[in-house]
């Protein structure tokens, strides 16, 4: 959908009425999906490389793992695949919109800012599905394990995906320079891969670093996902949900603060 038809469609109905909000949301969703379709294969490939790829590589480093260790690797793979989607690709897409001028165009539309944010977060959640499914399929096939999938898998994946995308969107709005955002996200991925207890127990970290991860979201992403895929490997899942909820809210507040300043 091009810029002119999008603006015309949004102008056709007041966004103050519930039906207008829904129509504007659907139009924005269609616009986002069509404009980002060239990124979809890249996003899925990146998820698989960092999710299943890292789980498989870790297995080469430690070839004789007990069953619990293998389950840690496999159940941590989805978190590794969701982090780059929300915290790298989302800021990169926003930076691309700034460069192309699409970002300012979207801000100028007569539609509530919350609708634009909701559309972006919805697209990210939809993109995450094939990457996470492929990551889990490859990891379980490689190690030959059977997961104990519970109904909690739905809220776990929804919250982790929403949190990662919300934080990434907040970062992209707070930092206006796309080059700085790119630098920050690359450093973030480096730190996550090397210094986050996602694919192994946090108890293997020094006490001070383990304490740091109590407040960061990465460890808690792995906890809620692992709890929904296995039994007996995680404890205190409620705290992890609270931490992820707090980071999600922080991302929304960051976006809202930037919106209020811009007007």
Question: Could you describe each region identified by the protein language model?
Answer:
Residues 113-114, 118-185, 233-245, 250-252:
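Alpha-helical transmembrane segments and their short interhelical loops
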Residues 38-64, 71-87, 188-193, 246-247:
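Hydrophobic alpha-helical transmembrane segments of multi-pass membrane transport/permease proteins
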Residues 2-50:
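Aromatic- and glycine-rich beta-strand/loop motifs that create alpha-glucan
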Residues 53-58, 83-90, 134, 166-167, ...:
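Hydrophobic/aromatic residues in alpha-helical transmembrane segments
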Residues 58, 62-64, 174-215, 219:
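Transmembrane helix segments
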Residues 2-12, 58-61, 141, 229-232, ...:
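Junction motif at the cytosolic side of a transmembrane helix
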Residues 146, 194-250, 262:
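Membrane-interfacial helix-loop-helix junctions in multi-pass membrane proteins
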Residues 50-53, 57, 70-142:
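Hydrophobic alpha-helical transmembrane segments of multi-pass membrane transport proteins
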